[in-house]
């Protein structure tokens, strides 16, 4: 089913909202699991092995949708692979920062993506932005400054990574809109999984061939360490992550098929509520007043962009 056909589908707003909130919850749960197990599994190990476990699951979905015969060919198309490369870079930046920041900070920084989409739309595909769009960019920038608090003790250079990830996410969004809007969802998901799995394998090989210094390995084992040992518990976690990834893909696809994207995307911000709860329950962390205000500004800017697109 192409995204261009979605306007002809019956619209079910309540179903779309329910599915996207379930997707946001699943994403927050996946991020929590990765953060909790970042001391036992490396980033590259998670990418590689989760990707392997997801392959049969993705093929099963493609088979159920009747696109299994052409799914690999479609997944390997040039523009689809470029989109997947952008998204894989997003996730690499996002997950690399997870052990060093609270979930709410990482999540809020990542939600700057709609603002970057506005900027890229103006200069890359020459779409009109208008005063409201530029005002949203300004509000979002102020929100980022308040969230990250540069120049204070609260600032962490790791917080720059989610912003880099948001930039790649915006590039992926633009690529989807311009070049990949008619690609079946199963092929898009398979392409992303293949690229992320390849990134995990390549990263692991590079670390093996060119071992980092002991200081780097001991300070940042999640990024520069060797693969952790895999027992039954670790395989269960990896399988859980694979299932969560598949659930997220299915829920998001269903949400955007059920209702207008501008309505659905508004409720993606429920993710921030979930990660604040996880931060408090699992790490006894709460954002300070300035960070909360920054999150509010970022969400407001994103909603302004979405409202403009309606």
Where are these predicted regions, by residue range?
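Hydrophobic transmembrane alpha-helices of multi-pass small-molecule transport proteins
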Residues: 132-149, 290-309
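Glycine-/small-residue-enriched transmembrane alpha-helix faces in small-molecule transporters
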Residues: 2-45, 154-178
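Transmembrane alpha-helices of multi-pass small-molecule transport proteins
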Residues: 40-89, 168-175, 192-208
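Helix-helix packing/entry segments at the starts of transmembrane helices
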Residues: 49, 106-112, 179-195, 246-280
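Transmembrane alpha-helical segments that form core, pore/gating elements
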Residues: 35, 58, 154-215, 224, ...
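C-terminal transmembrane-helix exit sites in multi-pass transporters
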Residues: 113-138, 273-292
């Amino acid at each position: 089913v192409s995204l261009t056909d979605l306007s002809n589908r019956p619209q079910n707003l309540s179903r779309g909202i329910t599915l996207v909130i379930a997707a946001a919850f699943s994403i927050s749960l996946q991020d929590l699991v990765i953060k909790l197990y970042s001391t036992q599994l490396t980033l590259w190990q998670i990418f590689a092995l989760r990707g392997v476990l997801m392959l049969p699951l993705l093929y099963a979905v493609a088979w159920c949708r009747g696109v299994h015969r052409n799914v690999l060919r479609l997944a390997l198309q040039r523009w689809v692979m470029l989109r997947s490369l952008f998204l894989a870079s997003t996730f690499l930046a996002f997950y690399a920062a997870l052990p060093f920041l609270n979930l709410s900070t990482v999540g809020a920084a990542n939600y700057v993506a709609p603002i970057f989409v506005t900027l890229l739309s103006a200069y890359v595909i020459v779409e009109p932005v208008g005063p409201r769009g530029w005002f949203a960019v300004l509000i979002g920038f102020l929100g980022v400054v308040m969230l990250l608090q540069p120049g204070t003790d609260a600032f962490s250079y790791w917080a720059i990574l989610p912003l880099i990830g948001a930039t790649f996410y915006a590039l992926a969004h633009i690529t989807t809109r311009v070049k990949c809007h008619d690609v079946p969802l199963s092929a898009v998901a398979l392409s992303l999984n293949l690229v992320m799995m390849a990134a995990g394998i390549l990263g692991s090989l590079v670390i093996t061939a060119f071992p980092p210094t002991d200081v780097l390995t001991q300070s940042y084992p999640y990024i520069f360490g060797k693969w952790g040992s895999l027992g039954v518990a670790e395989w269960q976690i990896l399988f859980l992550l694979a299932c969560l990834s598949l659930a997220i893909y299915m829920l998001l696809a269903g949400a955007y098929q059920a209702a207008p994207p501008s309505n659905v995307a508004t409720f993606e911000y429920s993710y921030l509520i979930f990660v604040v709860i996880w931060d408090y329950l699992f790490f006894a962390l709460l954002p300070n007043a300035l960070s909360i205000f920054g999150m509010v500004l970022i969400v407001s800017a994103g909603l302004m962009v979405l409202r403009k697109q309606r």
